[in-house]
Swiss-Prot record:
Boundaries of every GST C-terminal domain copy: 92-218
Catalytic class of the enzyme: transferase
Record-given protein name: Glutathione S-transferase-like protein OpS6
Record keywords, A-Z: Transferase, Virulence
Enzyme Commission numbers on file: 2.5.1.-
Length: 218
């Protein structure tokens, strides 16, 4: 990896989706440089030409002359391009497909609900969104339950069994902020398999590194 040029990551200091990409870059030991933008800056040039959707993250990989946006697509690219020894991926078609399925669940079920709750909390007075907050909190917990039930069935410690994958790690940045989204809630009481899984992932050196970097930027 020493001969590689740094991958350029465009990110937001607080938003969890860019930290998903940073985590995979760290786990794979890839060189990268981060440019932090505020959300309004993502809606205008020059960034809007890189990501027409005007959201973060995006990457520029000078090693393969590719520019890419959408965190899930970036993760899949990084795995296919750089995880040649299978550190975060699996060999069989079945396991590869299951890992993609869990990544897609993260993108379609975990991230949007948390994003909506954050946006509504910033946009409306709490008294105006009581029922919406209740629904979103229940949906956040529902996804915890989905993960907990699957981990219990698999016997753990990870989504695909004994080996960690990029799909496990994709969930981490959002759940590192769980106390902010669901205050005064301990998932270990209701979902012990989920809690053990998340605790194990938080002990990984790459997770600790991005957590420390994010805290330093706060």
């Amino acid at each position: 990896m020493a001969s590689l040029q740094p991958i350029k990551l465009y990110a937001h200091k607080k938003g969890p989706n860019p930290w998903k990409v940073a985590l995979i870059l760290e786990e794979l030991g890839l060189p990268y440089e981060t440019t932090y933008l505020e959300f309004p800056d993502a809606k205008v040039e020059p960034y809007i030409s890189l990501n027409p959707n005007g959201k973060l993250p995006a990457i520029q990989d000078p090693n393969h002359s590719i520019e890419l946006f959408e965190s899930g697509a970036i993760i899949e690219y990084l795995i296919e391009q750089y995880d040649k020894d299978g550190k975060l991926s699996h060999e069989s078609l079945q396991d590869k497909s299951l890992a993609r399925a869990w990544l897609h669940l993260q993108m379609s079920a975990q991230a949007p609900v948390i994003g909506y709750k954050v946006w509504m909390g910033r946009t409306y007075d709490a008294s105006q969104i009581v029922s919406a907050n209740e629904f979103l909190t229940l949906e956040i917990k529902r996804v915890l339950g989905v993960l907990d039930k699957h981990l219990a069935k698999m016997g753990g410690p990870y989504l695909l069994g004994s080996k960690v994958s990029y799909a496990d790690l994709a969930f981490v940045p959002h759940y590192m902020m769980l106390p902010l989204f669901v205050p005064d809630y301990d998932p270990a009481t209701e979902y012990p398999h989920f809690a053990a899984w998340l605790a194990a992932l938080k002990e990984r050196p790459a997770v600790k590194k991005i957590a420390a970097t994010k805290a330093a930027l706060a």
